[in-house]
Amino acid sequence: MVDTYEVMPWPDRIYQGLYRIAGTDQKERIPRSYSTQMQTMVNTLNDIRTSDKKITGTQGIGVLMANSLMFQRFPNHNGYDDPQFSSFYGQTLPLLKRGIPVELVHMENTPFKETFKGLHILVMSYSNMKPMKLEYHNYLADWVKKGGILIYCGEDIDPYQTVLEWWNTDGNEYKAPSEHLFEKMNLSRNPGEGTYRYGKGTVIVMREDPKHFVLKAGNDQKYFETIASAYQKKIGKEIETKNSFIVERGPYT
């Protein structure tokens, strides 16, 4: 059940924007009758009741997402491709197929403390998305410093690493946005594969694009074992693997 969402991003575009009238060059605002219908739908969605819910399985493992995730949809460029959203599925499916629920963490929400509540391990990759603001790295680094475990998967070789953005303009000379993040956590700009300490937390670097975890049969074992080992060391318990999920919502199972 999807019950956590933003009903209408940018309402000013809907109610105050000008839209072309079909078959003419004229523009006008949204028709009054349609705006009334739209507002009725908005109010209904705002009032949908929710209940406490829980998915069985090991909790506290998340995968980082960003608004830029859908920007990199060019199928093939300079010999690099990410077919069928494979980099995202490479981070999530190896866990889901073992019965481990995955929490999706939105980078744009990192300024809010509630974003990291209950989170022990965060997996991320810049192979399929890029940070739109450098400030997000401050929040990620601070979470690690306080005890979080960050697992970075990626070779940083996709062509989008070289687009003109904040990490390579205005005096910044980073070859990839991850270099800025690693530097924030007192690591070298391009650390090799391995485990590093930062404050009370840990940074684990895996130099393989996550798409390979699903595009190559049986290639997700190392990825899973890395997460399982990190979880065991932090929590003192083994990750629970199973072949099913049970959703408990209110009085229902």
Name every feature range the model reports, one short phrase each:
Residues 13, 110-113, 128-134:
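Acidic-and-aromatic substrate-binding clefts and catalytic sites of carbohydrate-active enzymes
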Residues 54-58, 115-117, 145, 196-198:
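Extracellular/periplasmic catalytic domains that process cell-envelope and extracellular macromolecules
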Residues 2, 118-121, 147:
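Short, well-ordered alpha-helix to beta-strand connector turns
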Residues 126, 130-253:
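A conserved amphipathic helix/loop scaffold
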Residues 1-90, 188-194, 203-247, 253:
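Hydrophobic targeting/anchoring helices
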Residues 116-128:
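Short, well-ordered secondary-structure micro-motifs within conserved domains or adaptor modules
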Residues 1-10, 96-103, 127:
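Catalytic-core regions of glycoside hydrolase
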Residues 93-115:
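A short, well-structured beta->alpha microelement
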